[in-house]
Amino acid sequence: MTQISPTRLHSPLDRLLVEAQRALDTVFGNPPAERPNPAADTPDVVLDPEQRLHAAGLMRINHVGEVCAQGLYFGQAAVARDAHTRHHLLEAAQEETDHLAWCADRLHELDSRPSLFNPVWYAGSYALGALAGLRGDDWSLGFVVETERQVEAHLDEHLETLPQSDQRSRAILRVMKIDEARHADQAEQAGARPLPAPIPSAMALASKLMKTVAYRL
């Protein structure tokens, strides 16, 4: 990726180029993880065709979740008013990049692919993140908390429904769940505002739609 000098990041064009590069890397690239894959030392097993398709569908949902998280965090960081909030968001986004890479690796192992709608998921999440950020950093952090809590819930569901023998996927999801819980706790400590009741419900409905589509496509 082309590096842009920090002294030039005040230019609107430079900021636009950075955001465009982040979007391309997330949606079409394969950003490398900074941490080792949690499944690296877990033996793989041969799943039957039905188990493999189910595991791939769940891991595709998780991959989409990480694409959405990247879009949300980058959208929020782009309009964050406080440098500490921006740093918090970008730091969380880096850990989500690890998750993105691990899920992509597992999809490849399962002879599957990411969602065809990743550009749509990213664009929608980026717009939501930017809108939340424009309301203020406390709102932005509130969206982080709610997003991570909902992700934790669906990771628990996936850990319950994955084929019992698919320990490689389980190893990845367990570490992801720990990270998501920490992101939510850190956002709360940083001053997150609790979101009004209709917003979490709308987010859950959108998440349900995403999961239904991403499981197959």
From Swiss-Prot:
Annotated localization: Cell membrane
Organism superkingdom: Bacteria
Enzyme Commission no: 1.14.99.60
Topology in membrane: Peripheral membrane protein
SUPFAM superfamilies in alphabetical order: Ferritin-like (SSF47240)
Substrates-to-products reaction catalysed: a 5-methoxy-2-methyl-3-(all-trans-polyprenyl)benzene-1,4-diol + AH2 + O2 = a 3-demethylubiquinol + A + H2O
Residues bound to Fe cation 1: 66, 96, 99, 180
Chain segments annotated as transmembrane: none
Signal peptide: none
InterPro entries: COQ7_proteobact, Ferritin-like, Ferritin-like_SF, Ubq_synth_Coq7
Cofactor: Fe cation
Pathway: Cofactor biosynthesis; ubiquinone biosynthesis
One GO BP: ubiquinone biosynthetic process
Annotated keywords: Cell membrane, Iron, Membrane, Metal-binding, Monooxygenase, Oxidoreductase, Ubiquinone biosynthesis
Co-factor: note: Binds 2 iron ions per subunit.
UniProt keyword Metal-binding present: yes
One Pfam family, short name: COQ7
GO cellular component term of the entry, any: plasma membrane
Function: Catalyzes the hydroxylation of 2-nonaprenyl-3-methyl-6-methoxy-1,4-benzoquinol during ubiquinone biosynthesis.
Record PANTHER family: 5-DEMETHOXYUBIQUINONE HYDROXYLASE, MITOCHONDRIAL, COENZYME Q10 BIOSYNTHESIS PROTEIN 7
Similarity comment: Belongs to the COQ7 family.
Protein name, per record: 3-demethoxyubiquinol 3-hydroxylase
Organism from which the protein derives: Xanthomonas axonopodis pv. citri (strain 306)
Gene encoding the protein: coq7
